[in-house]
């Protein structure tokens, strides 16, 4: 598994992990943050099939750009609207109390406050024996293409490391 950490303009620190499962390339994107007394807490995890997830991000970006243009042309100062876009998720909770969620809701929102647009991906994770987790990823207009680019770049690094590891292992058979 390869890991890449990216910091978004919207203020999130995301960790991208790559692996192959049953012949399918998988990416998992975890929000990474620090709490008092604890560092490197993974809160929630999006992604799955890498090509599907990137396609969902592109669709989200397209809708986001359309709504930004509409808001600017109409001088919208404040709005909060659910975006009609699907985002994949994994039920794996990446934090210190790791486990599988029994229910996950992932919903992107288009939000403008004082004429400043952003996309919020809101994530609710429900577990058998715990208080539900709630997390928000704040993404600026530049963050979604940046995230897609980081996924591609990180995956290429993952492939290069996997290939090198395989070559090294073959030397010592």
Regions found by a protein language model. Name each.
Residues 1-173:
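Positively charged, low-complexity terminal tracts
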